[in-house]
Amino acid sequence: MNGLKMLLFSTTLLTAFTLHAQVTLKQQVKITDEGLHFDGRNLDFSNVGTPDTGEKYDFFFGPNISAHGDAVKTYKHYVFMTWYKGGKSERNVMLSRYNTLSGELSTIEFPHRHTGFRGDPLVGESHNTIGLSVSPINGTIHMVFDMHAYDNNNHDGKFKDDFFRYSYSIAGAAELPHSEFTLDKFVKDTSEVSQGENDYKHLTMTGDLSDKGNFARLTYPKFFTTVDGTLLLYMRLGGNNNGAYVFNRYDAETETWSTFTKFNENNQKLKGNPYNWGLYGNMKYVNGKLRVGFQQRSNDNSDKYKYQNGVYYAYSDHPDGFGDWKNHKGEPMTWPLINSDEIKVFEPGDYVSHTDANSVYIVGSFDWTVTEKGDIHIISKVRSTDRSRPDYEEVYIHSYKPAGAEDFIISTDFTGASEIYTSGDNVYIVGLEGGRPYVEKAQGGTNNFVRVYEASDGPTFDHGTLYIKDGKVYYYLMERTSGNAMPLYLQIIDLDLDLESDANAPIVSFPSPSLTVEQGFEKLSLNIAAESPVEVRTIQSVTLYINDELVRTDTSLPYLFGHGSKPHETGAMGWLDTHEPNPSPLPAGRHIFKAVAVDSEGDSSVATMMLTVNSNAPIISFPQESLEVDEGFEKLSLNISAESAVEGRTIESVSLYIDGEFVRTDTSLPYLFGHASKPHETGAMGWLDTHSPNPSPLTSGTYEFTAVAIDSEGEESTATMQLVVKGEPEPPVVTWPNSTVTVYEGYEKLAITIDAESPVEGRDIQSVTLYRNGELVRVDTRPVWNFGHSHAPYEFGAMGWLDRHDPNPAPLSVGTHTFTAVARDSAGLETESDMTLIVLSLPGPSVMINESDISLLTEYQNLSITADASTANDDTSLVSLALYIDDQLVREIYEPPFEWGADGYSNELLELSEGSHLARVVATDSNNKQSESSIFINIDLLGDLNKDSVVDKGDTRLFTAKLRAGETMDIRYDFNGDGVVNNRDTRGLIRRCTYSRCTSN
């Protein structure tokens, strides 16, 4: 019944809200048929080393990389979109610009190609999105792209001097004519770390390479534009359970970016927090402020959360976010943030009943926004980790705080969504259903979502990303087809905000946005204020709802609810002698009061108030909320406190449960469980000589103790306590970034940071000791546990890389070497982990013949062959390149250019006989290592047109036929030397006949 009433109410609101507005699709345009998409297998660490080498494009994390992330923005009447070009062998970064006035589409292809998961182009990575922005002040275009926490050293150094990718244009490029909107309007990198002549990627945004450390280990670029046109960029620093949000600022006047500033610290444990944590959410610039909303992922893998937990929110009153950060209540927070609890809003995990380790899954379907009026809206989802468990739970949550309210309203009456957006004072859910776009809308500060747009035809889409500006949705979508190149579309959906209608809507408010009363409250009279801002309009009605149930409609002033004639309508008991007790008073808990005012023109507005009814139920508590004991504990006595909050009531009983299993009911004070007469009921072994050992003690694990108190009126309350039974001592965990590392002999640098931590709260790592092939290298007693750094360059056998480093007198030789790291914690426990270092001998030189296979006719006059070669490293030099034809040495050259058959040696390749010849160029380096490259030289008999190894009348007939057919002939068939090949040259061909009879004929 409640669901039906909610549906009817929402339909009424839809009619009111759309009286002056109609959400419509204004434009749809295809951007390309070649958007990159990953259509292969979803790999993991067990099979990422063996990706598909054919057409299928395997991936890590997810299949989407085009129309994904911060990929669409507007500037004046242009829409800009970034994408990667498909298919698998292309992968170029692309930028498209759509002119909404002329319909003209311009596209720029950049040289850079998606590098793939950890540098493997055969494995796509969905996190490597392209962030995009255009400065409204100077028309520069900015792109940050294709990175996932890279730095100079990780992933075997594949991203050295290329771990951050930033491209930008000259001023004014955003609105250049179609013919001038070209790649050369972007600025090349000409620094000392440039990747080549066509490198448009910059390692820093400041232009100063000394800042490069500030741009390392970053992921997920997203740009914002402030109210004054300033560009901000935010990214995530670090990893999933130890990260930070960082942001920087663009000065359009000087055309320079600042370095990144942290919103929160990473490595929080080193700064006094009990644990490290990372962020899963967003930083956004919305309603004139920089704000942050996220879920936390800690490195505690033993709690009930599989990954994330909590909802956290903060905002800055500084125009660019550089300070003045506060929680949702307006209270100052530590900046940069260290303890996330300072800004915690609520815990979604409380909305499911599971308590066992890793049983609660809070990933995905999280987003937030803030309306122009200041209403905060946060959506999230919590479910059981194991979808197959019989008590599976799944809850979608919409938590919102109307402007002016003190606390959030937490509603589970929500169908769920992946993203939430705002425009004006409304909030919107925009998504795909059945592959087609839809839009749902609610007034800010409410949970009244109604569908206002739904596409019924057109392409079916796989996914998309969007940007909302000036009341329009710019929905950037990928069509659902097949393969690793799929079409991309732009849809422009007009929300038709009807700002004039919004400005004319009634002004309605409760006396207070929130109120608290005691259960059984006698009186609650609410005088709701409602008036029209338009002089000639009047208020026709004010309707009150409680928890979306219709209470009453009032059509005349004052709009008073809960007055003496209707004492029960606000949930009160009644306060006059003439009032019968309310048979259905509001129970303890939170209740949403909603007032809907309608004016004489049919415009409507909504106001909400949250009423908190404090419970009359018993007050019950354990001595502690949580407790830790060692496995085999002898005694656990729990004196549970229980009393009534209402004078005259008594406690009738207290019952104890462990993980839902009934233990015992106690009906008299003290409510003591686990006492000497019942030592085993709390899971203990027993502690007196008279106690037999418990046959079923609590073993290692986490248990939930629940106490239920019932008072003399039958009302009940519960309290919980978590008991952690610790098993055998847990040693520290030590891990290498890579279990196997491969280098070439003579390698200059190998620096590795080893991760070591204790899984036991309160313990610290005291030391990490490194051994090489069983021999002690060094004991490190201070984090970070870094070996092979610039002050100890030889620890992993490297030669040394700085000018001050003497060459290592004992570098590691070619072969396999074992390095062992031993971590010791403050309890004296140790763990070791091995890494295998494979040292390969240097490869020979690289050599390539520049020509492809060559085909010539006998009596040819010219033939030359060229080659290029390089050595494996700068310390090795090239000795020579030698050309062999059919294994016969032609000539050995000792310095470039490497060319045979030219200059003073023009005859050395002439007079090769008819047939096929193998040409090989052999390169030799200073290590006496060789490599070779080869081609075939095919010499055909001049005049042998039919390829039968003789020149005869068959060839003369074929020659004549080709001339009649107008085919182009080799100029060497111009036997009479008149500059053309025609019938007059037939006699010259006949004279070349192999047999005399052909000549006479």
UniProtKB/Swiss-Prot annotation:
Residues involved in Ca(2+) 2 binding: 300, 303, 305
GO molecular function terms noted in the UniProt entry: hydrolase activity, hydrolyzing O-glycosyl compounds; lyase activity; metal ion binding
Database matches in SUPFAM superfamilies: Type I dockerin domain
Cysteine pairs bridged by disulfides in the record: none
Keyword field: Calcium, Lyase, Metal-binding, Signal
Annotated site residue numbers, Neutralizes the sugar carboxylate group at subsite +1: 236
Signal peptide as annotated in the record: 1-21
UniProt binding sites for substrate: 126-127, 280, 297, 361
Pfam family, one: Dockerin_1
GO BP terms: polysaccharide catabolic process
Entry EC number(s): 4.2.2.-
Keyword Manganese: no
Recorded family membership: Belongs to the polysaccharide lyase 24 family.
Function: Ulvan lyase involved in ulvan degradation. Ulvan is the main polysaccharide component of the Ulvales (green seaweed) cell wall. It is composed of disaccharide building blocks comprising 3-sulfated rhamnose (Rha3S) linked to D-glucuronic acid (GlcA), L-iduronic acid (IduA), or D-xylose (Xyl). Ulvan lyase catalyzes preferentially the endolytic cleavage of the glycosidic bond between Rha3S and the uronic acid GlcA, but not IduA, producing oligosaccharides that have unsaturated 4-deoxy-L-threo-hex-4-enopyranosiduronic acid (deltaUA) at the non-reducing end.
Entry protein name: Ulvan lyase, long isoform
Species name: Pseudoalteromonas sp. (strain PLSV)
